[in-house]
From Swiss-Prot:
Entry-linked Pfam families: Ribosomal_L20 (PF00453)
Protein name: Large ribosomal subunit protein bL20
Gene from which this protein is expressed: rplT
Assigned protein family: Belongs to the bacterial ribosomal protein bL20 family.
Function: Binds directly to 23S ribosomal RNA and is necessary for the in vitro assembly process of the 50S ribosomal subunit. It is not involved in the protein synthesizing functions of that subunit.
Taxonomic source organism: Limosilactobacillus reuteri (strain DSM 20016) (Lactobacillus reuteri)
Keywords annotated in UniProt: Ribonucleoprotein, Ribosomal protein, RNA-binding, rRNA-binding
Any Gene Ontology CC annotation: ribonucleoprotein complex
Length: 117
């Protein structure tokens, strides 16, 4: 007698089809294409978790640079000045200060300038 898989196969296919919900065209209708797309989606997710970190660092640096130049100093000089002044603050916090608390950022810039002179 031939075994058809029954509940196990249905459960496996249902799981894949549930993951493929919202995909376009046959990618959410047909099991084979849905399975391929779900696998591809996992690959994209894995890759983009790494890319995400790079993109945010880029964004923080752009924000810090813009705010620094408003205070007459370049990004690289600001970062070097902070290092010389032993001010250990990461780019995420620095960018947040630049956007939300301009006075505190200016105080840090002044400390960096003082350390460079």
């Amino acid at each position: 007698m031939r075994v058809k898989g029954g509940t196990v196969t249905r459960a496996r296919r249902k799981r894949i089809m549930k993951l493929a919900k919202g995909y376009r065209g046959s990618k959410h209708r047909l099991f084979k294409t849905a399975k391929d797309q779900v696998m591809k989606s996992y690959a994209y997710a894995f890759r983009d978790r790494k890319v995400n970190k790079r993109k945010f660092r880029e964004l923080w640096i752009a924000r810090i640079n813009a705010a620094a130049r408003m205070n007459d100093i370049s990004y690289s000089k600001l970062m070097h000045g902070l290092k010389v002044a032993n001010i250990d603050i990461n780019r995420k916090m620095l960018a947040d200060l630049a956007v939300n608390d301009a006075d505190a950022f200016k105080a840090l810039v002044d400390e960096a300038k003082k350390a460079l002179n």
